[in-house]
Amino acid sequence: MTFNHKKMEPKWQQYWSEHNTFKTTEDKDKENFYALDMFPYPSGAGLHVGHPEGYTATDILSRMKRMQGKNVLHPIGWDAFGLPAEQYAIDTGNDPEEFTALNIANFTRQIKSLGFSYDWDREINTTDPEYYKWTQWIFEKLYENGLAYEAEIAVNWCPALGTVLANEEVIDGKSERGGFPVFRKPMRQWMLKITAYADRLLDDLELVDWPENIKDMQRNWIGRSEGAEVTFKIKDSDETFNVFTTRPDTLFGATYTVFAPEHELIEKITTPEQKEAVEAYKKQVELKSELERTDLAKDKTGVFTGAYAINPINGEEVPIWIADYVLIQYGTGAIMAVPAHDERDFEFAQQFGLNIRPVLEGGDVTKEAFTGDGPHINSDFLNGLAKAEAITAAIDWLEKEGIGSRKITYRLRDWLFSRQRYWGEPIPVIHWEDGETTLVPEDELPLLLPKATEIKPSGTGESPLANLHDWVNVTDENGRKGRRETNTMPQWAGSSWYFLRYIDPKNSEAIADKEKLAEWLPVDVYIGGAEHAVLHLLYARFWHKFLYDIGVVPTKEPFQKLFNQGMILGENNEKMSKSRGNVVNPDEVVEKYGADTLRLYEMFMGPLEASIAWNENGLEGARKFLDRIWRLLVTEEGTLAEKVTTDANANLEKAYHHMVKTVTNHYENLRFNTGISQLMIFINEAYKRDTIPKQYVEGFVQLLSPIAPHLAEELWEILGHTETISYVAWPTYDETKLVEDEVEIVLQVNGKVKSKITVAKSLGKEELEKLAHEDDKIKENIDGKTIRKVIVVPGKLVNIVAN
C-alpha cells in the first residue's frame, strides 16, 4: 500500500497558499529567527536537483523554529540581472526582461512544487525598479563618501561578448561563458574602494560562526602583508621607483629588478637598442590573462630594458627587466628580485643568466633557491642576524636614510564595479561637457533602464546603452550638454544587500525600517554553495559595513552563521552539466516519487556539507521509508490504523523520548541524515509493537514534518486535527525516561566472551555471579574444571578463571 503524492502534494500546497500559512509573524513576545538561502539566478534551464539541497536545509530549520514558537523570516527572491539573459537577447533579438520573467515563473512553479515554506509576500527581484532604486541609492552614498571613483584600468576585454569580464570570469585566456578569446585593454571604469575596509573585513571574521576554511579563503583573498616599501633610483636619470617587499633583510641579495609590462616608466627608460624587443614583448603579454601570467608551472619569459637601477643598500647597479609574472595591479608594479631565496626569481635568473647571490646561510643556490631561514651572510651590518632582527634592522636603516619605510599591503584590489552591458542596474551618474560629473538627484531615483528594441554591443567597448542616443544625451536647465554613464553595475550589486530588503520589501522611503532591521539582523543562518565563499560574501560584508558606518544598519556583520552545502554530482561522480548530459531535473523526480521523497533523499544522502553522487536507488529507498510510515499508520480506507491507541505503552516510551531528543539536536546542528536515521529506528520499533500510543505518533509526525511536510499534514489530518501542523508546539522529551534501567553483561571464561545476558542495572556482585553460573553456555565451558577465581564488574562483566 502506498500514498498518492500526485493528489496529496498539490492539495497541501494549495492549502498553504490559500491560508497564507507561512506569512512572517512579527509577534513582539516571540524571538526572531532569520533563515536565508542564497537567492538563485533564474536561468533558462530552470531548477536542478542541486538547488533544493540548501533550500530544504533552511526549510527544515524554518519549519522547526515556527513550531518552537519563534517568528520566522524565510524569504525567496531572484538575482535576475546578469550576462546570460543579455547574451540570449543578443543571440535571439528577444527582450531580456521578458526572458527573465518567463524564467522566474518557471522557477516559482518548481520551488512551490517542492513545498518550501517561503513567505511569498516578501519576494524580491533585483531587476524591479523599486528594488534597484535602493541599489542605486547605495552607490550614490558610496560616491558621496569617496568610496566610488573612476580610473583607467587594464581590463579583460572580450570582443565577442562585447564586454569587460572580471578575473573570475576568465579561464585560461578565454571567457568562462562561450570560451571566447579575452585581451587586456585599458578602459575608464568605476571602482569601489573595498580596500578601505580591508582590516575590518579581516578582523571581524572573528565575530561570526563560519566554517574555518571559508574564513581562510577570505583571509587569503584580502592577503595582508607586513614589510617595507623601498625606493630605487634609476642610473643616469632623475627617475625613481618603489618596490614593496616582505623581506627587506634580503636587499643585499637583490641582483635585478622586474617591472610589469604596463609600468609607466618603461617607455622613458628603455634604451634604443632594446626598444623593438620591449614593444614586441608588451604586445605578446596583452593576449594573456592574469592566471596565465602568474602560472608557476610555465616557462619564465621576459626582456631586458637596457636600463639599470641602483640597489639602495649597497650602491650596486642592477639590471631592470620586464616580465609578465609581475602584475601592475599588485603592489607597485615593480619587484626587487632575490633569486637565491625565491623560486620564481631563481628560475628567471637561471633562464636569463642573471647573478644569484646568497644572503642566508643554508642550501645550495647553484642547484635551487634556498627558501628556509638561516643567519644572514654577504649582508654587511645584517651578517649573523636571524630573520626577525634583520628585518627590523633593515627597515630602521632604510627609514634613517630616507629611502624606505614600514608598510602594510593587501592582495585585495578595489572592486571593479562597472560592466559594459545593457542588462544591469544603470549607474546614476552624468558626465557634463565641462568635465564635471554629477549624480542623478536622489528624488529622481530609480534611474530606469531604458527599453531597447535591439541589444547589440556598441563595438567601442561601451555598453549597448551607448547606442540609445535619446537616453544617453541630456541637457541641464542652463543648456549644458551631458552624457549619462553607459556602464551598468555588475550582478554582484543587487546580491550585496538583498537580505536587508526582505526585512521590509515594500518600503518606498528607505531600504528598510530601522526598527525592523534591528529586530531581524544579523541573519541567523545563511546556507549556500561554497563557490560564493569569497566574492559574494566579501562584497556583501563590505556594503553592510559601509551601511553600518552611515547608520543604516545596526550590526557590523550581516550573517551570523554560514553553512555551505556540498555539491550533488552526477551518477558517475562528475559535476552535473548540460554538456555531460547528466543533469537531473527535479520536475521528473517530483512527478515520479513526490517532493517529500526528493527532500528526504537529499537530506539523507550524507552529511549536508559532503559532495555526493546522485543515485536513483537512494530515491527508491527514501520513497519506501515514507510508504512504511503510511502503511503503519493508515488503513486501506485512508483512516487511522487500529494499532494507534490512546493507551500508554511503556515499551515505546524510551524509544520515543530518545527520538525527540536526538532528532531535535541533529536538526539544530544541520545533521539531517542522522536525524532521519533516528526517525527510521523509531518506525522499526513501532512495527514490533501491537499498539502505538497516539501521542507518540503525533510527536513522530511533527518531527517528520520539516522533512516531508505534505505527508505530515495528511497524517495530521487523519489523526483528527483540523488546523495545519505548521504551528503546533514542537515535541519535548523527558530526560528521566532516557535513563537505562537495564544493562548488557558480558560473561567470560578465562577472558574469552562465551555469553551475554541483559539484567537490571542495580544487580550486585553476588546476584551477577549466581546468574553467570546458571548460564548454559558458561556451564558447558567450565564443566570438569576447577574454578580458581571469579571477577565481577557490576554493569559490565563476569569473568570466571577455571582450569
Swiss-Prot record:
Binding site for ATP: 578
EC number annotated for this UniProt entry: 6.1.1.4
InterPro entries: aa-tRNA-synth_I_CS, aa-tRNA-synth_Ia, Leu-tRNA-ligase, Leu_tRNA-synth_edit, M/V/L/I-tRNA-synth_anticd-bd, Methionyl/Leucyl_tRNA_Synth, Rossmann-like_a/b/a_fold, tRNAsynth_Ia_anticodon-bd
Keyword Protein biosynthesis annotated: yes
Source organism superkingdom: Bacteria
This protein's UniProt keywords: Aminoacyl-tRNA synthetase, ATP-binding, Cytoplasm, Ligase, Nucleotide-binding, Protein biosynthesis
Ligase recorded as keyword: yes
Name under which the protein is recorded: Leucine--tRNA ligase
